[in-house]
């Protein structure tokens, strides 16, 4: 099972709630106040947070829909609510939010709240992967799609495609150890000619998406 929390969460944890959502700062839950051990990085949002976020989500804001889905899935309002998480991930993903698309792909891959389907997982990972830049769900989608190609799940096993998506998931850096390790795993299965082919596909992809990168 792959982590579904969007990378933008780390910004939330470091600098506070997203300004665009105008959420209140997370409140320490009663269990924490009572001295019960709890993950200090796990956000806890108030009812006011939920009300504000839900209002924005209902008005069609894709980012708010994604955050609402994450909150329901992770239990940030108290108890996890997978059906509502799935509902809002689908709405946000349909609007093109890459974090939601990647998370929806992972729900299909893991069979969380839905019938497991590697085919649908690949579909949503691919949608996330096509976004530029590669931060957050786009980069995660590329890595996850690469893993499906590496393992032959939902798509034919294809080391060239796996290598290509792993390379793209790294963006302009190699400082993502798990993704770099995945790239190495694919390369070990390939001939030099196949690696050259994959590198060529990476450059072709970048050219096709050049306008989005500017």
For each feature predicted by the language model, list its residue ranges.
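N-terminal leader/linker segments that initiate helical-solenoid repeat arrays
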Residues: 23-67
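Terminal, low-structured helical/coil segments at or just beyond the last alpha-helical repeat
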Residues: 176-214
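Hydrophobic face of amphipathic alpha-helices that form TPR/SEL1-like repeat modules
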Residues: 35, 67-74, 78, 103-110, ...
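Short helix-capping/linker turns of helical repeat alpha-solenoids
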Residues: 58-61, 74-76, 81, 94-98, ...
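Bacterial N-terminal signal peptides
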Residues: 8-20
């Amino acid at each position: 099972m792959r982590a579904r929390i969007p990378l933008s969460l780390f910004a939330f944890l470091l600098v506070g709630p997203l300004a665009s959502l105008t959420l209140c700062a997370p409140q320490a839950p009663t269990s924490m106040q009572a001295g019960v051990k709890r993950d200090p990085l796990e956000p806890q949002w108030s009812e006011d947070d939920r009300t504000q976020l839900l209002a924005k989500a209902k008005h069609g804001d894709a980012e708010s829909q994604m955050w609402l889905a994450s909150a329901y899935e992770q239990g940030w309002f108290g108890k996890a609510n997978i059906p509502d998480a799935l509902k809002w991930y689908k709405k946000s993903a349909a609007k093109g939010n890459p974090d939601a698309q990647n998370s929806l792909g992972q729900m299909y891959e893991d069979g969380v709240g839905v019938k497991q389907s590697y085919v649908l997982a690949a579909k949503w990972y691919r949608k996330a992967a096509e976004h530029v830049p590669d931060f957050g769900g786009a980069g995660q989608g590329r890595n996850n799609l690469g893993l499906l190609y590496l393992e032959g799940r939902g798509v034919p096993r294809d080391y060239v495609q796996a290598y290509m998506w792993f390379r793209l998931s790294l963006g302009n850096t190699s400082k993502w150890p798990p993704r770099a390790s995945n790239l190495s795993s694919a390369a070990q299965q390939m001939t030099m000619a196949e690696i050259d082919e994959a590198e060529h596909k990476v450059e072709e992809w970048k050219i096709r998406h050049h306008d989005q990168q500017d």
